[in-house]
Amino acid sequence: MNTNTQTEQQIIREETRIDKIIKKRKKKMRAQVLLCPTITAYGRLYCAPRRLHRYNSSSSSSQFLNLNLSRFSGALFFHMEQFQSGTGSSGKRGMVENLKRYGVISSKRVAQVMEALDRGLFVPVGSSAYVDTPVPIGYNATISAPHMHATCLQLLEDKLHPGMRALDVGSGTGYLTGCFALMVGAEGRVVGVDHIPELVDMSIKNIEKSVAASFLKKGSLSLHVGDGRKGWQEFAPYDAIHVGAAASEIPQPLLDQLKPGGRMVIPLGTYFQELKVIDKNEDGSIKVHTETSVRYVPLTSRVEQLGGF
């Protein structure tokens, strides 16, 4: 065998070896989802991948997407694993346990509240309530994914002690509003606002079937039809304000209704959005920091929403 033949065979072997490596890498990459820019949240690197904010209409079983952080070629990825979370009490328990396992929930209070209030009562019949994804609720609106509810509850937890006041803008089917009520108790006050009357009616019926029903009956929890961009002045100021849709800028009425020492969590931006945490100082000035990249429906008028934005 001459030198040229040996060289050609070596080249072929090397090309074959490289092809195998590339195919193996591609296969591994397909099973992983690249994270959006990571942030430090709850003592660890965490960021919700954009894929988790989209609804998978082909999913008919109650499966929870486990989030397993690992390193590959110096980058962080989420492994998407399927977990049978079941239905009812076993479903919500499985959902919460997995959010705890992967570092999304670190607060005992938040875990207890999300397990107490059954998400299955707040999604349309036939939807996968315990999958970590947003679910369409009609009227061009969605109920946020469980990991976003958990994130917002933890960001607002210090402002949701018994006796405090909370405003939920874009209250939808009422799930997060009900969570707020469980946290501030009967001596507190929780207000949900949505500009779609049918969703407000739906949220009231949902809460009436839940563990938060007593707060609705007592009057410490109320849901109203209105333009959430204007807040709800009647029970202001609020210790905590949550906005469930993305605004291009912070609505001034919401800032005005935020109590000094209070906190607002709001997604800001158009196509590229960030979840902002706004703390109002005692002198009325504000401090803003970015928590993570997100993707929400826009905070807009009822006409624009029903028209598909």
Swiss-Prot record:
Name the record gives this protein: Protein-L-isoaspartate O-methyltransferase 2
Coiled coil location: none
Keywords recorded for this protein, A-Z: Methyltransferase, Nucleus, S-adenosyl-L-methionine, Transferase
GO MF annotation terms: protein-L-isoaspartate (D-aspartate) O-methyltransferase activity
Keyword Transferase appears in the UniProt entry: yes
Provenance organism: Arabidopsis thaliana (Mouse-ear cress)
pH-activity dependence text: Optimum pH is 7.0.
Catalytic residues (UniProt): S144
InterPro entries: PCMT, SAM-dependent_MTases_sf
